Structures are given as C-alpha cells and as structure tokens.
A protein has these predicted regions:
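Short phosphate-engaging motifs
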Residues: 33-34, 69, 98
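Conserved non-catalytic scaffold segment of RNase H-like nuclease domains
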Residues: 1-45, 50-51, 74-90
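Acidic two-metal-ion nuclease catalytic site recognized across multiple nuclease folds
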Residues: 100-156
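Hydrophobic side chains within alpha-helical segments
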Residues: 37, 61, 97-98
Length: 156
C-alpha cells in the first residue's frame, strides 16, 4: 500500500523531473527555502540540474511589498479573503492550493507578478537567507515601493 510504503526517493525525483520539464516557472511562498530544500533532495537522490534555467517566483517577496508584517502564508490567505476557499494546514497539498489561490488574488490585485520573476527580497537585518540561488537576484526589502523598482542589488 502506498500509504504504508511510500515511494522511493528515486521515483519521486523522476516524477519531479517530469512535472517541471520544459518551459516551467517554479512558484512558491518563501521560494528560497523550498528551492533549497528541493535542490539538496535532488542532489542526494536525483539530478539538481533540472532546476537550472527555470524561472522562479517568490510570492513571499510580492506579499512583503504589498502588505505590512506579519508575512506568513496564513496572513496572505486572510488578507486576500481566501479563508473559506483554502486551508493553511501546513500540509503539502493544502499549501499548494493556498499558494495558487494567493497568486491568483495577487495577480487580480495588481498585474505585476512578471516583474518579480527571479527577484527575491530579504529582510535587511537578517541578511540573505542561506546559500544564494545563482539565477536569482536578491535585494533588501525595506518597503516604500515595489522591489523591482529598487536600484540597489545585494552582493551575496
């Protein structure tokens, strides 16, 4: 039974490779964390090069530009009035549905998501989170105007 035995790491890596093959954008809420986790999983059990050349969109960066603290996914769900539509149970599938709903609400609010592709923000007092992703530009997020309009690029 799948629930008892699960899937092999190799099988999961193959499935991930098939899902993100081709011209795919990788979207997440707190994408740096998720992509780092995925990279190291693929490094041990698959091929991390499948992530190379993929566009990346971090909805946490977008949310920080649009709303005051706090910035958890739950806060975004509440801010966009999605509580009756999605759950923030911190379960993988629920998080996927919640992230998709938040992205749709963000796009309906302001159609500038393309400006955030491969642009991740970070809180200056904490610095860049972990090892930088090579294809991503990191900028300190201080508020006031959209991050994509900021001129300062972080040196990481």
């Amino acid at each position: 039974d799948l629930r008892e035995r699960g899937l092999s790491k190799e099988r999961v890596c193959r499935d991930i490779s098939e899902i993100i093959a081709g011209n795919t954008i990788l979207i997440a809420y707190n994408a740096h964390f998720d992509l780092s986790f995925l990279y190291y999983f693929l490094l041990r059990s698959g091929d991390p090069d499948i992530l190379r050349g993929k566009d990346k969109l971090d909805l946490l960066t977008v949310y920080r530009d649009r709303r005051p603290y706090p910035h958890r996914l739950l806060n975004a769900i509440e801010a966009y009035g999605l509580g009756g539509k999605v759950r923030n149970s911190h379960r993988a599938l629920d998080d996927v549905y919640a992230t998709l709903a938040v992205m749709e609400a963000m796009d309906a609010e302001k159609q500038d998501l393309v400006q955030y592709v491969d642009l991740f923000g970070y809180i200056p007092k904490f610095g860049c989170p972990g090892k930088p992703i090579g294809s991503v530009t990191y900028r300190p997020q201080t508020g006031g105007r959209p991050l994509y309009e900021e001129g300062e690029i972080a040196h990481v």
